Every structure is written in structure tokens, then in C-alpha cells.
Swiss-Prot record:
Tissue specificity field: Expressed by the venom gland.
S-S bridge residues: 34-60, 43-64, 47-59, 53-68
Protein name: Supwaprin-a
GO BP annotations listed: antibacterial humoral response; innate immune response; venom-mediated disruption of cell wall in another organism
Localization per record: Secreted
The organism's place on the tree of life at top rank: Eukaryota
Name of a matching Pfam family: WAP
PANTHER family: ANTILEUKOPROTEINASE, WHEY ACDIC PROTEIN WAP
Recorded GO MF terms: serine-type endopeptidase inhibitor activity
Species in which this protein is naturally found: Austrelaps superbus (Lowland copperhead snake)
Keywords: Antibiotic, Antimicrobial, Disulfide bond, Secreted, Signal
Domain (WAP): residue spans on this chain: 27-72
Gene Ontology CC terms: extracellular region; extracellular space
Role summary: Damages membranes of susceptible bacteria. Has no hemolytic activity. Not toxic to mice. Does not inhibit the proteinases elastase and cathepsin G.
Length: 75
């Protein structure tokens, strides 16, 4: 069998191994529980704008949460 055929066969075997069983069985649940939510209320407004944050931090919005965070810089 050529190397291309072997790679194709290996690809199909990999896909087959990753498929969910068609018998309708779900994968077993992972052990443990989710930790409690952080103690912040669901909607917190720590800041109103960048200038209400200390130093170089920015006022970042995440849904209804406004909090001061260190900025990231993308090249």
C-alpha cells in the first residue's frame, strides 16, 4: 500500500475513533462538581470609564459587569 493510502487509512481510523457512539449513549459525566460562582453579584459596576480605574487599567465591560483590568496590547 502506498504512503498516501496509509495516511488516508490512518485519517479514517482517527475519525472513526473520535465519533460518538450511535447507540444513543451519552459519554459518562466527568467526576466532581462545578465550583461556586465568584462572590461578586451578577452585575457589578466597578468603574464608569477608563479614567475611573487606577494607573494604566481600563474599564472593561463583560455583559453587565464593568471592572478595571490591565490592558493587553496586540501587535
Amino acid at each position: 500500500m502506498s504512503s498516501g493510502g496509509l495516511l488516508l487509512l490512518l485519517g479514517f481510523l482517527t475519525l472513526w475513533a473520535e465519533l460518538t457512539p450511535v447507540s444513543g449513549q451519552d459519554r459518562p459525566k466527568k467526576p466532581g462538581l462545578c465550583p461556586p460562582r465568584p462572590q461578586k453579584p451578577p452585575c457589578v459596576r466597578e468603574c464608569k470609564n477608563d479614567w475611573s480605574c487606577p494607573g494604566e487599567q481600563k474599564c472593561c465591560r463583560y455583559g453587565c459587569i464593568f471592572e478595571c483590568r490591565d490592558p493587553i496590547f496586540v501587535k
